[in-house]
Amino acid sequence: MKKEINMENLLYIIIEGGLKSLIVIIGLLIGVAFATLLERKVMAAMQKRRGPNVVGFVGLLQPLADGLKLVLKETIIPIVADKIIYAIAPILTFTISIVLWSVIAVGVQSVFASINSGVIFILAISSIGVYGIILAGWASNSKYAFLGGLRSAAQMVSYEVALGLIILSIITYAGTVNIQEIMENQEKVWFIVPLLPGFLLAFISALAETNRPPFDLPEAEAELVSGYNVEYSSTGFALFFLGEYANIILMSVLLSVFFLGGIVSNKISGAMKGVGMLCSFIWVRATLPRYRYDQLMYLGWKSLLPFALLIYIGVISMVLIIK
């Protein structure tokens, strides 16, 4: 009897986990479709043109058409590529982007479960994301892909340090590593008010972490053709694309959670904050030119890191004085 109950519980856990995973994947696909359409429409408006307007009403079905086009294309694997690692790399990148969403609060509870150390979980899992890109660059056996992978690894590691210090400052100020409790602590005053310099540093680091302009060095077309995914087509390229935009949406949501209160007021205002942060990413892409690689490294290690350390020390001092 005990064995049957355990088997029933196991089956329930598997079914529940599968359904929740499906919800996250479908939500991400819809979110990425919305983000790509929003990006193209906003950039078109900034450049005084119309943007996508052919497929569907005012171009609303354009992301669906692009997705179908990618999936229906032939998957071409280079002869000199390491085929197993070549296939694993985009799957790994997309899987990590899904796992990161498991602790993001979309209501009273998170998608999967309310983890007490949700912030630490995000920091730990996000640091693994670089492996998919490195594996893609190495397995493609192409100098452009390899250089793009190396650049991405160096860039993500460099800016993770500064971003980690800013998140530590938020944890210290809030006195918790639970995402839900961090939002609840901002009911009266958003953290952007006392931690405005930290917000600016976190935003710059988020741009670099997601390889967005002006820090899109791993995909620099003029230098590396397309970077680490230059040898990918069809589903492989689509998975990298989905993973990249899922991370952009995640960073937008995290910035709104850490500094703007997230969904502490209501879900609609929380969604508007996330969309506002996403529009900020798009605005930066449309206005700023790309950095040189040496300037990127200089900014990360000699400017952002010392400032992030000063902010962290300042937050610790402020908390000690208040207490």
Swiss-Prot record:
According to its record, what are the GO cellular component terms?
mitochondrial inner membrane
- List GO molecular-function terms, semicolon-separated: NADH dehydrogenase (ubiquinone) activity
Major location category of this protein: mitochondrion
EC code(s) of this entry = 7.1.1.2
- Which key words are in the record? Electron transport, Membrane, Mitochondrion, Mitochondrion inner membrane, NAD, Respiratory chain, Translocase, Transmembrane, Transmembrane helix, Transport, Ubiquinone
Q: Where in the cell is it found?
A: Mitochondrion inner membrane
Q: Name one GO biological process term.
A: aerobic respiration
List the membrane topology term(s): Multi-pass membrane protein
Record-annotated membrane-spanning stretches: 10-30, 52-72, 84-104, 119-139, 157-177, 189-209, 245-265, 268-288, 302-322
PROSITE patterns reported for this sequence: COMPLEX1_ND1_1 (PS00667), COMPLEX1_ND1_2 (PS00668)
Against InterPro entries, the record matches this protein to: NADH_UbQ_OxRdtase_su1/FPO (IPR001694), NADH_UbQ_OxRdtase_su1_CS (IPR018086)
Reactions catalysed, as given in the entry? a ubiquinone + NADH + 5 H(+)(in) = a ubiquinol + NAD(+) + 4 H(+)(out)
Protein family membership: Belongs to the complex I subunit 1 family.
What does this gene product do? Answer: Core subunit of the mitochondrial membrane respiratory chain NADH dehydrogenase (Complex I) that is believed to belong to the minimal assembly required for catalysis. Complex I functions in the transfer of electrons from NADH to the respiratory chain. The immediate electron acceptor for the enzyme is believed to be ubiquinone.
The record's annotation in PANTHER family points to: NADH DEHYDROGENASE SUBUNIT 1, NADH-UBIQUINONE OXIDOREDUCTASE CHAIN 1
Q: What is this protein called?
A: NADH-ubiquinone oxidoreductase chain 1
